Regions:
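Acidic, Ser/Thr/Pro
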Residues: 1-142
Length: 142
């Protein structure tokens, strides 16, 4: 058995309107801590065109329908919650789950303001791989 590092990076730019109905963007990801050792999600968020902060939430995917309906989030316990113009942080989940990374502009006081947000997500983990799987992969690539 070998343990191989894995890295997956997503770079996006979103235009997120204000308001409750469409003032957010959701990126889904899944983590299986049995297969993905030392998983971490690093993220770098930057509001490009505004002096008003954006909110970043990480929720369980099953909480998303309730979050969309609930304006104050009081019934939902997020795994992560932070506001800012620039957010550079790391999320290390403690349980395997399907997660939702939410860029939230629903609280914006300016109803017509569309925020341009640069989002860089980097998923890192280690995975145990059998030697035979490596050899088979090398054969198919060559």
């Amino acid at each position: 058995m070998k343990i191989l590092p894995h890295v997956m990076r997503n770079i996006n730019e979103f235009n997120i309107p204000a308001g409750n109905s469409h003032g957010y963007e959701i990126l889904y990801f899944g983590v299986n801590l049995i297969l993905m050792f030392k998983y971490r999600l690093s993220f770098d968020i930057k509001v490009q065109n505004s002096a008003k902060e954006i909110e970043i939430l990480i929720l369980g995917r099953n909480d998303i329908p309730a979050w969309k309906e609930n304006k104050d989030n009081s019934e939902i316990k997020p795994y992560y919650n932070k506001n800012g113009l620039k957010i550079n942080d790391v999320f290390r989940p403690t349980i395997s789950d399907a997660y939702a990374f939410v860029i939230n502009n629903r609280k914006s006081s300016i109803s017509h303001e569309v925020k341009t947000v640069e989002v860089i997500l980097t998923h890192n983990w280690k995975q145990e791989v059998k030697e035979s799987q490596l050899k088979e992969h090398i054969k198919t690539q060559g």
